[in-house]
Amino acid sequence: LLESIPGCSNQIASAIISEIKDIKRFRSQSALAKYCGLAPREHSSGERIRHFVDRRGNRKLNNAIHRLAFGQLGSNCKSPGRWYFVKKVKEGKSKLSALRCLKRKIIDIVFQILTKREKYKFKFSSCYDLNKDLKIPA
């Protein structure tokens, strides 16, 4: 089922499944993202509140999601992940922050696929123009 995601090879899919084991362990997409290390952590002291990336998650799962995200960002790839990444960069996010957003989106999709037991289907909407230039801004 995971191989229906663009850029997901057999090796990446098996790595994701072997690290997640049973999807029923996670009550929500947020719980899976936290397990993977993709959910932001809050660090507060007094009036100051900051959010940072949690590095304590499952690094093997995070690495598999990272490889999947880069598979969607290929130079000639017209995947939904590339559109999402370009959209986030054009919104003003740094490339690293946009990559984090893409990884979180992918882990949400993985959760949906494994809970619903359905292949991934991307519906093109008006915001995704096939003829649009998908070059990543410098």
Segment roles from a protein language model:
Residues 1-4, 10-95, 131, 135-138:
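Phosphate-backbone recognition surface of nucleic-acid-processing proteins
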Residues 90-138:
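Basic, amphipathic alpha-helical segments enriched in Lys/Arg and hydrophobic/aromatic residues
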